[in-house]
C-alpha cells in the first residue's frame, strides 16, 4: 500500500517476506501451516495472496503475483470437494471458531481467468456454509458468535483466541467487494459435480501427493471426509492444540463433527490404548506410508510407549 502511494519501502525485506510466504506452498492448492495442514491455507494464504496480487502485485511485482494466482488455480480441483453435497464445511483443524471464513477464497476465484471455475457451485458452498451456522440458535450468545463450532465448545478453542477472534468469520463477506455483474454473483447456484458426476453407490477419493491429504466424497450420504497430517507429542506441544482432537483424528467427516475425548475411554474417530499410567491414550503420532488401490496407509506409534505400534489401512467404502 505504501509503495503504491509513492512512499519508499524496504524492497529487499518486502521481497524476502513474499518468498517466505510462497515457500510455504506445497502443491495442489495447499500451503503448509508449519507443520500441519488446516484452513489457514484457505482463509489466510489463499485469501490474502490473490487479493494482494490483484490489487497491487500484478503491477509492482508481477512474478510473485503470478505465483500466487497459479497457486490459487491449483486449489479449484480439490478444496471445494472438502464441503458436503449440501455445502456444509468440515470441522477440522485449529481456529474453527472462524467458521464460514473458510468460504473466503471461493469468491476470489473471480480473479481466475482460466474458465475452469464453476462459480455457481462456489456460491452455493458459501451460502450453505453461512446457513449451516446462522440457522442454529446456539451460534450466537449476546449477539456475538460463540467460541466453538455450532455453539460454545472449549476443546476447539486455542490459547491465542479471544471473544473477538470469531470476527474472522467476516472474511466470508469479502465477496461483497465484487461487482454485481461478476461471474460469482451472476451465476446460478448449483451443486457442481454432486449433481451428476458423483454417483451413488460409489466413493470418490482425491489424493494429493504433494501433501498426502486425502479428501473422500460419499454420494450415498452426501458427506465429505478429510484425512490429514498429525505427528505431535503432547509433551512437546507448547501451543496445546497441535496434538489434540483438532488434528489427531483418523479422519474428519462433514456429517459427524468431532467430539472431545473423555478420560474414561469415550473416544471418537481414533484408537485408544490404556497406557502404563492407566490412562486412555489416543494415537497422534502418524506417519503416512502410501495411497494405492483406494487404500490409505499410515503407521502410528503410542507417544508414551514406542513399543506399541499400529499399521493402519483405511479403505473408504460407499456407506463407510
Task: Describe every region a protein language model picked out.
Residues 1-191:
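Extracellular polysaccharide-recognition and catalytic grooves
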Residues 110-320:
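Extended polysaccharide-engagement surfaces of secreted carbohydrate-active enzymes
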Amino acid at each position: 500500500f505504501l509503495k503504491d502511494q509513492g512512499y519508499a519501502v524496504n524492497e529487499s525485506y518486502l521481497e524476502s517476506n513474499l518468498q517466505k510466504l510462497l515457500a510455504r506452498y506445497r502443491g495442489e492448492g495447499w500451503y503448509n501451516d508449519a507443520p500441519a495442514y488446516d484452513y489457514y491455507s484457505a482463509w489466510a494464504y489463499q485469501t490474502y495472496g490473490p487479493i494482494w496480487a490483484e490489487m497491487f502485485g500484478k503491477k509492482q511485482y508481477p512474478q510473485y503475483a503470478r505465483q500466487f494466482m497459479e497457486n490459487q488455480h491449483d486449489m479449484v480441483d480439490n478444496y471445494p470437494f472438502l464441503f458436503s453435497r449440501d455445502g456444509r464445511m468440515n470441522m477440522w483443524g485449529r481456529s474453527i471458531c472462524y467458521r464460514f471464513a473458510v468460504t473466503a477464497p471461493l469468491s476470489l476465484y473471480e480473479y481466475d481467468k482460466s474458465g475452469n471455475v464453476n462459480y455457481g457451485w462456489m456460491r452455493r458452498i458459501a451460502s450453505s456454509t453461512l446457513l449451516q451456522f446462522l440457522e442454529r440458535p446456539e451460534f450466537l450468545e449476546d449477539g456475538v458468535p460463540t467460541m466453538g463450532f455450532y455453539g460454545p465448545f472449549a476443546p476447539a478453542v486455542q490459547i491465542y483466541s479471544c471473544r473477538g477472534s470469531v470476527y474472522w468469520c467476516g472474511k466470508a463477506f469479502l465477496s461483497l467487494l465484487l461487482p454485481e455483474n461478476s461471474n460469482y454473483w451472476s451465476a446460478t447456484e448449483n451443486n457442481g459435480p454432486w449433481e451428476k458426476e458423483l454417483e451413488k453407490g460409489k466413493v470418490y477419493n482425491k489424493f494429493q501427493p504433494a501433501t498426502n491429504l486425502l479428501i473422500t466424497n460419499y454420494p450415498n450420504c452426501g458427506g465429505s471426509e478429510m484425512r490429514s497430517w498429525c505427528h505431535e507429542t503432547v509433551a512437546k506441544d507448547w501451543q496445546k492444540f497441535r496434538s489434540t482432537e483438532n488434528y489427531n483424528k483418523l479422519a474428519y467427516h462433514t456429517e459427524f463433527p468431532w467430539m472431545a475425548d473423555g478420560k474414561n475411554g469415550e473416544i471418537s474417530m481414533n484408537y485408544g490404548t490404556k497406557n502404563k499410567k492407566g490412562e486412555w491414550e489416543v494415537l497422534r503420532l502418524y506417519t503416512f506410508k502410501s495411497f494405492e488401490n483406494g487404500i490409505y496407509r499410515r503407521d502410528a506409534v503410542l507417544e508414551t510407549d514406542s513399543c506399541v505400534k499400529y499399521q493402519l489401512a483405511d479403505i473408504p467404502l460407499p456407506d463407510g
